[in-house]
Amino acid sequence: MTIGVVGRKAGMTRIFTEEGVSIPVTVIEIEPNRVTQFKTEETDGYRAVQVTVGERRASRVTAAQAGHFAKANVAAGRGVWEFRLEEGDFQAGDLIKAELFTAGQLVDVTGQSKGKGFAGTIKRWNFRGQDNTHGNSVSHRVPGSIGQCQTPGRVFKGKKMSGHMGAERVTVQSLEVVRVDAERNLLLIKGAVPGATGGDVVVRPAVKARG
């Protein structure tokens, strides 16, 4: 897997092409990713680079975390992320910035979707509602049957039912990088990405890139 970067969703806006076409874009702020550890096959069994972003007060860092950051000689961040590597070498303290990507490149963006709380099957799974009239009584939004009778005598795993919606890891694939603002550490990506404004997102080169 190719290395990516960790950023923060700043919100959405739009830009115009020279032809006057409006393109909706998500602005992602790419704070410099500080390398905290470089893992090798000899010592860890696989190749990977571990990074952190942002800052965290010393009172909010455990002793183990503080020692890990101190060993890498980097400031404590708000978390650690890891990217598998096939080639290339990094050292603790190296910086990875928005220049890793170029305009026109396709990327996959991973984030935590907005939590919707407890939701019914119509909202959560796009079920159709039942008849409003024609003898239907207080069953307008119920899901209906959830299985058979004595055989098999149970509800199959994975059955679509009411439950907690959102607040889960989501990846949107093959989004286009419209613009890279290296001076302000910004990526402008076409379309929407998962999560709320201010949430952490991971941007990687697309695994299904065309061409």
Swiss-Prot record:
Record flagged with keyword rRNA-binding: yes
Gene Ontology, cellular component aspect: cytosolic large ribosomal subunit
NCBIfam families, per database record: L3_bact (TIGR03625)
GO molecular function, one term: rRNA binding
Mod. after translation: Methylated by PrmB.
Organism: Pseudomonas entomophila (strain L48)
Protein name (record): Large ribosomal subunit protein uL3
Gene name of the record: rplC
Entry similarity comment: Belongs to the universal ribosomal protein uL3 family.
GO BP terms in the entry: translation
Subunit text: Part of the 50S ribosomal subunit. Forms a cluster with proteins L14 and L19.
